[in-house]
């Protein structure tokens, strides 16, 4: 089996160059699960001093850069916060959201808070269910069904999400602004 980085070494070099230019502290490695997937790992503090320091993994799907469905949000680069874990944050804020929206789960889902935080999705990862940042809204997606976004652009988008998430958790912006998605 040939992985995307073996069959398209030029794309691999471009991915590495983009990450080294914009996120030089991130390191690339291969998943130890036998899947052949590559990932980047590093920390960012997008809100600046006093903000949360996020330990992040950017995981390439083996189909990179091909996107096979318009529902494949985020393209082929998945953003997994290791610390803080989104699942932990979501579980902490969900009771507040439930109270705010009078325990109306249909309304909570319509408002975009079905998992407790806006613009996240859950997926099995190893032995755990983890929450990932949805790293691209289809209307802002930099790519198409032929070419996916790069890790650098996915992480840039995720950093904007992290800033707004922190502001929302601190009560600095409203639910509506947090859900708008124009980050």
What does each of the following model-derived ranges do?
Residues 1-183:
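UBC/E2-like fold recognition across ubiquitin and ubiquitin-like conjugation systems
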């Amino acid at each position: 089996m040939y992985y995307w980085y073996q069959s398209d070494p030029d794309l691999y070099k471009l991915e590495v160059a983009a990450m080294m230019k914009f996120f030089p502290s991130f390191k690339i490695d291969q998943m130890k699960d036998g899947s052949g997937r590559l990932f980047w790992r590093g920390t960012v503090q997008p809100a600046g001093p006093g903000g949360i320091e996020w330990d992040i993994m950017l995981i390439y799907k083996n189909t990179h850069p091909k996107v096979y469905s318009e529902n494949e949000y985020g393209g082929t680069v998945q953003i997994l916060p290791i610390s803080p874990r989104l699942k932990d944050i979501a579980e902490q804020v969900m009771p507040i959201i439930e109270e705010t929206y009078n325990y109306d789960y249909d309304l909570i889902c319509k408002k975009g808070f079905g998992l407790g935080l806006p613009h996240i999705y859950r997926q099995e990862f190893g032995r755990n269910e983890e929450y990932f940042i949805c790293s691209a809204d289809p209307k802002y997606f930099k790519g198409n069904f032929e070419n996916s976004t790069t890790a650098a652009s996915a992480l840039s988008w995720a950093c904007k999400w992290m800033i707004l998430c922190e502001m929302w958790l601190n009560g600095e912006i409203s639910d509506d602004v947090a859900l708008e998605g124009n980050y």
